[in-house]
UniProtKB/Swiss-Prot annotation:
Protein known as: Outer-membrane lipoprotein LolB
Lipid-bearing positions (N-palmitoyl cysteine): C26
Transmembrane segments: none
Lipid attachment points (S-diacylglycerol cysteine): C26
Protein's membrane topology: Lipid-anchor
Function: Plays a critical role in the incorporation of lipoproteins in the outer membrane after they are released by the LolA protein.
Amino acid sequence: MTVYLHDVNRGLGVFLLVVSFLLPGCSSSGGRRASVPVMVDATAQVVEQARQTWLQEHPNWGFHGRAAISQGRDGGSVRVEWEQHGRGYRIVLSAPMSRQSWVLSGSSSGPARLEGVGGWVRVGEVAEQVLFEATGWQVPMGLLPDWVRGRNSGGGDVQLDAEGRPHRVYQRGWQLRFLDWFPSSVGRPVLPRQIEASRGSARIRLIVDQWDELIP
């Protein structure tokens, strides 16, 4: 990814941000189209930088939401209850239609543990692999903690919206789109309300119903 940041008018504080990357094409070759320039003014840049700083300073968080996950013709919907304490996480997934539920817990620096209905347990070094072996779902667990909050962790190609927030992200073969945001509230900046991720035949659509700030 190449990012060119030019000072268009210092008096007006307007900047031209050109994020050069390739969008996934519709052809089987997976070609990409170059993005168009996005105008991000200085005020929006300051607000977004403050938001990124706030995210870094608040590592304990959680949310309640819903997710639709599909792999080709197979898929399902689950309720999601996510608690994140620094690098540690506890995620409850429940599928009302099939009456199945799973609890995924662990740390980004340690093994993952998945518990299912009936008391069975799977343990592995990579949370994504543990979840895939049990459910058949491809879910980028290592990327989601940053994605779900719209945090720029680096390592991916990013297209910004006019507010300076991430609009599209390409990382490790995944394409992520931010579709909707919660407005800012007292003591909390804007946070994603709806995101969509895809890689090959894998599709994930997440809707956050409520954000929670957890006490350390």
